[in-house]
């Protein structure tokens, strides 16, 4: 089903025309909603600390999570105290939930579980981003909030908007959901503060972002605490797959082919490359269908969901976002201006 949808969105399949009436309805509803905020019929809430929203305007993966991880590291290095709020897509909870490293994706969502495991950052998930932000401020000492995947959540006033684009697929056929991949029209690109192009060539008004592989990590080495300061499991040993080895691969993300292409670019020979649905809750049985004893490589997001039943020959490819220094400089300048406007000083150092 997922591959057929991608044919409609990105390969010009004629079935898109059958969905066009629904896209027109989607356009009408979303336009009225934006107009309600613009005219003051609905109110956006302003928070006492700067808010950075990271999102996209297409359905599926574009590189938001690596971007959030990059921002966390950047802000901590510069002396800020960041916290994260997220929708917690796919998780089962009521209200708002304080995320602790080691919580499962079923509890808090795929991306929050991965971010918490990697960084140990203060984080709250909730369907209502404003309530999540208030809980974050009440429970943690943070002075800047990163909103993961909140570009269309207009009830939350933001100081900086960062749009992440898949550089290869970009906006597909240019149509709104469900006939196309767009949550909002391509015009939205012109209203944000920063546009990051993940992969391929960036346009003149975009910052080029690449995802740099940093090595393979044993899935079985993931444990119930933050991995932020623990790199002992990254050491290469004789069992670690190396370029030229024949491996199997799996991915349950928005764009599995990007992951498979990355593995091949690293020199791995893919015997099997299996696509799972995005946000799939894996069981040991699911993996058994593709596991023939060869090294099995997966994404970090999938690894967090498979850690409870991981085998010794399962590995995930760790990646870090790489962005030009000009982006970091301009982002920090924007945050300092926002903090000054809100609090009469910079970031409280």
UniProtKB/Swiss-Prot annotation:
Keyword hit for Lipid metabolism: yes
InterPro entries: LpxK, P-loop_NTPase
Main enzyme class: transferase
Pathway: Glycolipid biosynthesis; lipid IV(A) biosynthesis; lipid IV(A) from (3R)-3-hydroxytetradecanoyl-[acyl-carrier-protein] and UDP-N-acetyl-alpha-D-glucosamine: step 6/6
Positions that bind ATP: 58-65
EC number: 2.7.1.130
Catalysed reactions, as listed in the record: a lipid A disaccharide + ATP = a lipid IVA + ADP + H(+)
Cellular component, GO, one term: plasma membrane
GO process annotations (BP): lipid A biosynthetic process; lipopolysaccharide core region biosynthetic process
GO molecular function: ATP binding; tetraacyldisaccharide 4'-kinase activity
Entry keywords, A to Z: ATP-binding, Kinase, Lipid A biosynthesis, Lipid biosynthesis, Lipid metabolism, Nucleotide-binding, Transferase
PANTHER family: TETRAACYLDISACCHARIDE 4'-KINASE (PTHR42724), TETRAACYLDISACCHARIDE 4'-KINASE, MITOCHONDRIAL-RELATED (PTHR42724:SF1)
HAMAP family: LpxK
Database matches in NCBIfam families: lpxK
Family, similarity comment: Belongs to the LpxK family.
Name used for this protein in its record: Tetraacyldisaccharide 4'-kinase
Protein's organism: Shewanella amazonensis (strain ATCC BAA-1098 / SB2B)
């Amino acid at each position: 089903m997922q591959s057929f949808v991608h044919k409609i969105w990105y390969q010009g399949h004629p079935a898109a025309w059958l969905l066009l009436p629904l896209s027109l309805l989607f356009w009408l509803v979303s336009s009225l909603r934006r107009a309600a905020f613009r005219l003051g019929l609905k109110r956006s809430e302003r928070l006492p600390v700067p808010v950075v929203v990271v999102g996209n305007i297409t359905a599926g993966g574009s590189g938001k999570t690596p971007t959030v991880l990059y921002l966390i590291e950047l802000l901590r290095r510069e002396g800020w105290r960041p916290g994260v709020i997220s929708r917690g897509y796919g998780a089962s909870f009521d209200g708002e939930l304080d995320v602790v490293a080691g919580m499962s994706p079923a509890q808090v969502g795929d991306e929050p579980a991965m971010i918490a495991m990697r960084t140990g950052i203060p984080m709250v998930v909730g369907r209502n981003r404003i309530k999540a932000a208030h809980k974050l401020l009440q429970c943690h000492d943070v002075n800047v909030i990163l909103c993961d995947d909140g570009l269309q959540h207009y009830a939350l006033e933001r100081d900086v908007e960062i749009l992440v684009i898949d550089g290869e697929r970009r906006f597909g056929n240019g149509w709104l959901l469900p006939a196309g991949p767009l949550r909002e029209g391509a015009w939205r690109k012109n209203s944000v503060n920063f546009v990051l192009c993940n992969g391929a060539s960036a346009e003149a008004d975009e910052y080029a972002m690449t995802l740099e592989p940093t090595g393979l990590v044993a899935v079985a080495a993931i444990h119930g605490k933050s991995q932020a300061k623990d790199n002992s499991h990254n050491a290469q040993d004789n069992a670690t797959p190396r370029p030229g080895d024949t491996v199997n691969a799996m991915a349950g993300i928005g764009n599995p082919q990007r992951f498979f292409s990355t593995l091949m670019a690293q020199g791995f020979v893919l015997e099997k490359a299996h696509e799972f649905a995005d946000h799939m809750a894996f069981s040991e049985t699911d993996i058994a269908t593709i596991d023939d004893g060869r090294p099995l490589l997966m994404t970090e997001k999938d690894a967090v969901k498979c850690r409870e039943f991981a085998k010794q020959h399962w590995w995930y490819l760790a990646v870090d976002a790489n962005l030009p220094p000009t982006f970091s400089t301009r982002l920090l300048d924007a945050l300092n201006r926002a903090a000054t406007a809100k609090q009469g000083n910079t970031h409280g150092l």
